[in-house]
UniProtKB/Swiss-Prot annotation:
GO terms for biological process: alanine biosynthetic process; pantothenate biosynthetic process. Belongs to the PanD family. This is Aspartate 1-decarboxylase. The keyword Protease does not apply. The gene is panD. The lineage of its organism: Bacteria, Pseudomonadati, Bacteroidota, Flavobacteriia, Flavobacteriales. HAMAP family: PanD.
Length: 116
């Protein structure tokens, strides 16, 4: 049997922008993406700690060492600049593999979104 498990998590990052006119996605500082083992185009779940919203979108890389976290397109309506998010990517694996799997967990600086 295969199950869905947390593969990657970027915990408590601050929204730096919301671009309603962009075609969609979330832009994430590429340093954060690499630290969390999230790749361009990967589907992620966004959890907004400020308003309880949850949504799914895909990732595009932002400039390194900027702390950028920008929601684009329709998702921009679900956040405000300064909101705190949790970004989660899931994987599918066999139950036995999942028992020993260790996700990539990233806890950036809560003020700058940069890696500590």
């Amino acid at each position: 049997m295969q199950i869905h498990v947390v593969k990657s998590k970027i915990h408590r990052v601050k929204v730096t922008g919301a671009d309603l006119d962009y075609i969609g996605s979330i832009t994430i500082d590429e340093d954060l993406m690499e630290a969390a083992s999230i790749i361009e185009g990967e589907k992620v779940q966004i959890v907004n700690n400020n308003n309880g919203e949850r949504l799914e979108t895909y990732v595009i890389p932002g400039l390194r060492n900027t702390g950028e976290i920008t929601l684009n397109g329709a998702a921009a309506r679900k956040v405000a600049k300064g909101d705190i998010l949790i970004i989660i990517a899931y994987g599918i694996m066999e139950l036995e593999e999942a028992r020993n799997f260790k996700p990539s967990l990233v806890f950036p600086d809560e003020e700058t979104n940069l890696l500590k």
